[in-house]
Amino acid sequence: MDQAEFEKIIEHTRKSRKYRELILPEETLQDMLTAEAALGGSKAEVIQRFRKKLHNVIAPYLENIDYAQETERMKACFQVNPTPDQVKAWALSVMQKHASTRERLPNIEAFCQCLHGHISTPDRILDLACALDPLLLPWLDFPNETEFLAYDIHQPRVDFLNAFFARAYPSAHAIQQDILVNPPAQPADCAFFFKEAHRFEKRSPGCNRSFFQALP
């Protein structure tokens, strides 16, 4: 397939009913389609493999969270100058809607205490493939000057997190970036990579070692 065909497939995928609300990075689709095309076969076979791999990798993002609605709920919460406990209650209500994040909620206090005990107060943290992990910040209680950079490929989620950061964590930023294709260039004292290595392996077997080595 030539580049024009690649672009047509990518554009069709981004606009499909299944994926359009995610606003996936073009670099993600280009990387996955290129990898499948390199394996050979007919155009139909390449597209079939691409769609299957894309579903396996992206399926966890196909959640039932209305991030525009959650942003409005968050704004309402912060309009009344909430207490720390009220912020935590709001964060829990959102994390409960995300399958992967929900699994750690019964142990959230112990998890955050253990995590904080290991990393103390780093100057900069990278949260790689963050999902809703940044909503743990009210429990981690880092200093205001701690820089927290959260990376995800789901644009509506990134926008939601940035709205949250703007109201509560001015040194935090969410970035839409495919970290496997384009690893973060910023050096950091600590990086979170929660429950994502297996999905990287599904996408590109054996990639985790080179990914970790690419981090500054």
What role is predicted for each listed range?
Residues A37-H118:
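Conserved Class I S-adenosyl-L-methionine-dependent methyltransferase catalytic core
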Residues T121-D133:
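Conserved class I S-adenosyl-L-methionine
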Residues L132-N144:
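Conserved SAM-binding loop of SAM-dependent methyltransferases across substrates and taxa
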Residues L137, A188-S204:
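A short SAM/SAH-binding and catalytic strip from SAM-dependent methyltransferases
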Residues E147-D152:
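Conserved SAM-binding motif I beta-strand of class I
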Residues H154-P156:
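Conserved SAM/SAH-binding beta-strand->alpha-helix loop
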Residues L161-N162:
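Conserved SAM-binding loop
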Residues Y169-L180:
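Conserved SAM-binding strand-loop segment of SAM-dependent methyltransferases
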